[in-house]
Amino acid sequence: MRSGLLPPGLNESDAESNSEDEATLENSGLNLQEDKEDESIRKTEIIDFSTDEPKTETESNVNAYEECPSGIPIDMWNKFQELHKKHSEQKSTTSRFRGKRRKRSRKDKLKNEKELHSEPSSNETQWKELTQYFGVNDRFDPPVKRKKVEKSGLEKRIDQAVEEWNIEKAEELSNQLATRELGVKIAKAVACHNFVKAKKEVENSQAARKKKKLAWGFEAKKRWETKSNMGYM
C-alpha cells in the first residue's frame, strides 16, 4: 500500500492493480533486455566458432595422429607415425619433381620450336634443289598437235567413273594420277640434278688438269729460253 491520498475516481483496488501492471511491465522489459543480450552473446559465439572451425579440425587431425588411441600398443603406433611421415615426405618430393619436369618439358618445347623456325630442314633444301629442275627438258618434247596423246589405263578409269557419276571414285583415281605424275617429275628432276652434278665434277677435274699442264709447259718454255740464250752468248 502506498501512503498518501489517491486521485479522485480511484479506489485502493485500482491502485493495487495498477501497481501490479507496472511491475509486470518492468519484468517484461528486463526479460527483453536479457533476451537481446543472450542473442548477441550467441551470435558472437557462433562467429568465433565458425572462424575457429578449421583450426580445431586441423588440430584434431594432428592430435589424432600424435595421440595413441586406446587398445593399440605404443610400438605399433610409433611405426604407423613413421610410415605416415615418410608417405607425406614422398608426396612432397614427387610434387616438386613433377613441377621441375613440367618446367623442363616447357623449356625443351620452346627450344625445339625455335630450332624448327630458325633452321630449315634438310628435306626442304633438297626439295628446293629438285624443284629447280622441274620441266627443264619439256622444251625437247614435240608439240601437242604432233604428239599422239594416248590415255593410260588410269585416265580411262577416271573417265569411266565420271560418266557413271561416281565422284568419290573419280577423285580417288585423280589423286593417284597426280601422285604418279609428281613421281615422274621428281624422277626426271633427280636424273637432271645428277647429270648436272657429274658434268660439273668433270669440268672441274679438266680445269685442274689444264692448270697443271700450263704450269709445266711454262717452266719448260722458260728453261728452253734460258738454254737458247746461253747458246748465243
Swiss-Prot record:
Coiled-coil regions listed: 144-164
Keywords in alphabetical order: Coiled coil
InterPro entries for this protein: FAM204A
Top-rank lineage group of the source organism: Eukaryota
UniProt-annotated stretches for the region Disordered: 1-126
Record flagged with keyword Coiled coil: yes
Residue stretches of biased makeup (Basic and acidic residues): 39-58
Entry keyword annotation includes Coiled coil: yes
Gene name linked to the record: FAM204A
Compositional bias of kind Acidic residues: 13-24
Organism (species): Pongo abelii (Sumatran orangutan)
Compositional bias per record (Basic residues), positions renumbered to this chain: 97-109
Protein name as it appears in the record: Protein FAM204A
